[in-house]
């Protein structure tokens, strides 16, 4: 995948505040040991999280506890 942009992510998550919340939560999950959902070698966790969101691999669940 080429360079990831916020616009790519906003196509999947139209609310930019929700996008930031999702990316932060996903980074936290990865740092706690969760596996990456997309292949993205040599990238920082935030870039991987945004790639996952743009690829529609991450979604919001109503049952998800809010830890932010």
UniProtKB/Swiss-Prot annotation:
<dbReference type="InterPro" id="IPR036161">
    <property type="entry name" value="RPB6/omega-like_sf"/>
</dbReference>
<dbReference type="InterPro" id="IPR006110">
    <property type="entry name" value="Pol_omega/Rpo6/RPB6"/>
</dbReference>
<keyword id="KW-0548">Nucleotidyltransferase</keyword>
<dbReference type="GO" id="GO:0006351">
    <property type="term" value="P:DNA-templated transcription"/>
</dbReference>
<comment type="similarity">
    <text>Belongs to the RNA polymerase subunit omega family.</text>
</comment>
<keyword id="KW-0804">Transcription</keyword>
<comment type="subunit">
    <text>The RNAP catalytic core consists of 2 alpha, 1 beta, 1 beta' and 1 omega subunit. When a sigma factor is associated with the core the holoenzyme is formed, which can initiate transcription.</text>
</comment>
<keyword id="KW-0808">Transferase</keyword>
<protein>
    <recommendedName>
        <fullName>DNA-directed RNA polymerase subunit omega</fullName>
        <ecNumber>2.7.7.6</ecNumber>
    </recommendedName>
</protein>
<dbReference type="GO" id="GO:0000428">
    <property type="term" value="C:DNA-directed RNA polymerase complex"/>
</dbReference>
<keyword id="KW-0240">DNA-directed RNA polymerase</keyword>
<dbReference type="GO" id="GO:0003677">
    <property type="term" value="F:DNA binding"/>
</dbReference>
<dbReference type="InterPro" id="IPR003716">
    <property type="entry name" value="DNA-dir_RNA_pol_omega"/>
</dbReference>
<comment type="function">
    <text>Promotes RNA polymerase assembly. Latches the N- and C-terminal regions of the beta' subunit thereby facilitating its interaction with the beta and alpha subunits.</text>
</comment>
<dbReference type="Pfam" id="PF01192">
    <property type="entry name" value="RNA_pol_Rpb6"/>
</dbReference>
<dbReference type="GO" id="GO:0003899">
    <property type="term" value="F:DNA-directed RNA polymerase activity"/>
</dbReference>
């Amino acid at each position: 995948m080429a360079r990831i942009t916020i616009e790519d992510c906003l196509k999947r998550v139209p609310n930019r505040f929700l996008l930031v919340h999702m990316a932060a939560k996903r980074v936290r999950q990865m740092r706690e040991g969760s596996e990456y959902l997309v292949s993205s070698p040599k990238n920082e966790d935030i870039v991987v999280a945004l790639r996952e969101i743009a690829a529609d691999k991450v979604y919001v669940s109503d049952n998800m506890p809010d830890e932010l």
